[in-house]
Amino acid sequence: MRRFVRSLSSTGRSQTGSLPVRGLRKLLRFYQLTFSSLVGTQCRHLPTCSAYMDEALARHGVWAGLFIGLARLSRCHPWGTAGYDPVPDQLDANVPRLQPWRHGRWRGPLEITWKPEHKDQNL
């Protein structure tokens, strides 16, 4: 028996079951098993770009997830960003539905909002 992992979008609807999401995720998996495994992992980010796109599609659906993934691909080049770059947990509510490209971060470094707290201030 198969187990299905359900992912919720910002609207609360499951996105992993829709036909376009499943189709795009299968294409990504095909890429990972064929071309990516032959060439090797070359991505500058963690998670890799294909894993990032897969998670963005599963979490946010085709409409926003595709643009979030494309924005990540546009940053993955020798002069682009590098390092840990997670998929956003939720979409910006102020972005109009007909402008999904505004969900993606197209350039610039990842903004770190968390700062470690030191208990000993004498460091």
From Swiss-Prot:
The keyword ATP-binding does not apply. Its main location: membrane. It is a peripheral membrane protein. It comes from the Bacteria. GO terms for cellular component: plasma membrane. It is found in: Cell inner membrane. Transmembrane segments: none annotated. InterPro entries: Membr_insert_effic_factor_YidD (IPR002696). SMART domains: Haemolytic (SM01234). Keywords: Cell inner membrane, Cell membrane, Membrane. Belongs to the UPF0161 family. Could be involved in insertion of integral membrane proteins into the membrane. NCBIfam families: membrane protein insertion efficiency factor YidD. This is Putative membrane protein insertion efficiency factor.
